[in-house]
């Protein structure tokens, strides 16, 4: 699984003894600037059998830099939610590279870094008279969206 390709979660769950608990946009992780950095993602996996994850990720220590005055993106992080022998749970930072062994019910959270921004936000505001630049996300419309929204209401 990579950060550049979105694999089908159903295939992942079929091939490996893992349950995908979360796969979402990491809002606010992109750098601030005239052209904001892209958002990272959050992926959470729960082991359904004893298993080993091999991690090879970057930008966990050093944040993705911005260019031409743009702000840096947020760094990524990899966390494991482990079960202790006394029944308690403990969060562990597993770093950017290495091996993580999980027992059934334990979880691995992968927060990918946000992208660095390009261009100074202050200069863009002065040049364009823009009060504030916000991320815009696609919103569904039309009959299919209305049908799906109706099905999810009750």
PLM ranges: what are they?
Residues 1-154:
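Glycine/proline-enriched, intrinsically flexible loops and inter-domain linkers
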């Amino acid at each position: 699984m990579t950060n550049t390709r979105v694999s089908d979660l159903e295939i992942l769950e079929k091939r490996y003894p893992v349950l995908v608990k979360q796969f979402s946009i990491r809002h606010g992780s992109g750098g601030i600037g005239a052209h904001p950095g892209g958002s990272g993602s959050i992926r959470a996996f729960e082991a359904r059998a004893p298993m080993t994850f091999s991690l090879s990720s970057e930008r966990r220590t050093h944040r993705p830099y911005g260019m031409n005055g743009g702000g840096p993106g947020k760094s990524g992080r990899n966390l494991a939610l482990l079960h202790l022998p006394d029944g308690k749970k403990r969060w562990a930072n597993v770093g950017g590279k290495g091996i993580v062994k999980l027992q059934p019910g334990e979880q691995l959270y992968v927060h990918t870094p946000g992208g660095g921004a390009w261009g100074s936000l202050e200069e863009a505001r002065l040049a364009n008279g823009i009060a504030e630049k916000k991320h815009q996300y696609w919103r569904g419309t039309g009959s299919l969206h209305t049908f799906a929204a109706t099905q999810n209401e009750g």
